[in-house]
A protein has these predicted regions:
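Short hydrophobic beta-strand element within catalytic cores of glycosyltransferases
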Residues: 297, 305-309
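Glycosyltransferase donor-sugar binding loop
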Residues: 209-214, 238-251, 267
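A short, active-site helix/loop in glycosyltransferases that binds the activated sugar's phosphate group
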Residues: 141-193
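Nucleotide-activated donor-binding/catalytic signature segment of Leloir-type glycosyltransferases, i.e.
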Residues: 251-269
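Conserved acidic donor-binding segment of nucleotide-sugar-dependent glycosyltransferases
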Residues: 322-331, 338-343
């Protein structure tokens, strides 16, 4: 079966092969069981590309099966529609990463089966991008909602949130996170508990994994919370940020509040090295204004970290209600950080490590592959 994936991500052509970011590779790898993959993606042409484009696509997408289009913002250009239309004509199944209305219409016009891959809330994404984003959010939200509702198949990354916001009449749909966690080892939990028991009860290392130049990721609210705690005499909380992007805005904010010595930028870290950093932290914070199901939070849970998160998207699906903060609330974050105890860290280590088992590769792959089998059988019957 020939499968076309139209993805709102970037691919780079380098040394006679194609390269993409690890998270994009993971997405594409999971679709290989459906058949022969072709890809429509944005062309990546930035410096230091090896830091981001770190996985070769050979074996997932054949060299002559990558076609470049511009990233889809509001609507596709006429030129890109023509390119996608040509690719669709050679496919049996069209998958749109993000549920693009334009890709949906092209597939429908050619009588091709269409799958929406719903990874985040488009409303939150646009609404949190200033006045222009708020202006177009209702329009793009309704288009996306229509697309998902009328798709032949839908794959969600949440268990509940995106399903409620973007319901579907699809023949088959599945809720399955795109987190990648290998089999969990009880030694990880034991090491976490030993780490907690050595804690002095004051000095705390907290961490967020997200790009540092995207404001809707919310790191600024954690910095403001630290400022509130500093005013209360707490200067022993250190905030570590894992992720690429310009640091200018957050550095200015930290300087304004006199928190430069408490803010630590670790940059982009290879995925296989992230866990060793998480093992040195006490609390993971996910203050986002837009998410699907945050894989970084699940990864933190798999290391037994206590997690705090905003009431955004599927974050409340992952953690207990008392650790969910109001969106944009530095006060809520400060209150929770100030009240952390050793007993709380131990309880949450057990709870979160157990919850992370639901997101192991073997569990999710089985659920996803069962869904893919239904899709294949429906198309090939």
């Amino acid at each position: 079966m020939r499968v076309l994936i139209v993805i709102n991500q970037s691919v780079e052509e380098r040394d006679n092969s194609y390269w993409c970011a690890s998270n994009v590779y993971d997405i594409l790898r999971r679709f290989t069981c459906l058949g022969e993959l072709s890809l429509c993606a944005d062309r990546y042409n930035a410096k230091k590309s090896h830091l981001l484009m770190d996985r070769e696509l050979t074996g997932v997408v054949a060299k002559n099966h990558v076609t470049y289009i511009n990233k889809i913002r509001l609507r596709m250009s006429q030129q890109d529609r023509a390119i996608v239309s040509q690719c669709v004509s050679q496919s049996d199944l069209v998958i749109s990463h993000g549920a693009s209305y334009d890709v949906f219409r092209i597939a429908r016009n050619q009588g091709k089966k269409f799958m929406s891959f719903v990874v985040s809330c488009i409303w939150d994404g646009y609404w949190n991008h200033g006045w222009l984003g708020k202006l177009v959010a209702p329009y793009i939200f309704l288009l996306t909602r229509y697309t998902v509702n009328h798709s032949d198949y839908v794959l969600y990354v949440t268990s509940d949130f995106l399903q409620r916001r973007y319901p579907t009449q699809a023949k088959y749909n599945c809720g399955c996170s795109n987190v990648r966690i290998t089999t969990l080892d009880e030694n990880t939990l034991n090491q976490r508990l030993a780490f907690i028991r050595k804690w002095d009860g004051r000095t705390m290392r907290i961490v967020t994994m997200a790009a540092v130049d995207i404001k809707y990721k919310g790191q600024q609210f954690v910095i403001k919370a630290m400022h509130q705690l500093k005013q209360q005499g707490r200067t022993d909380i250190h905030y570590y940020l894992i992720g690429g992007g310009s640091r200018d805005y957050l550095e200015r904010l930290a300087k304004e509040y006199g928190l430069e010595s408490q803010l630590h930028f670790l940059g982009k870290i290879p995925h296989d090295e992230v866990f060793s950093v998480l093992d040195t932290m006490h609390v993971y914070v996910q203050p986002s204004l837009q998410e699907g199901l945050p894989r970084s939070m699940v990864e933190a849970m798999s290391r037994g970290l206590m997690c705090i998160g905003a009431d955004t998207a599927a974050i409340p699906e992952l953690i207990e209600p008392q650790f969910v903060t109001r969106r944009r609330s530095a006060t809520d974050i400060a209150r929770l950080l100030a009240s952390v105890t050793t007993e709380q860290l131990i309880t949450q280590a057990h709870r979160n490590f157990k919850e992370a088992h639901h997101y192991e590769d073997t569990v999710l792959d089985q659920r996803r592959n069962d869904f893919f089998d239904k899709v294949k059988n429906d198309i090939l019957k």
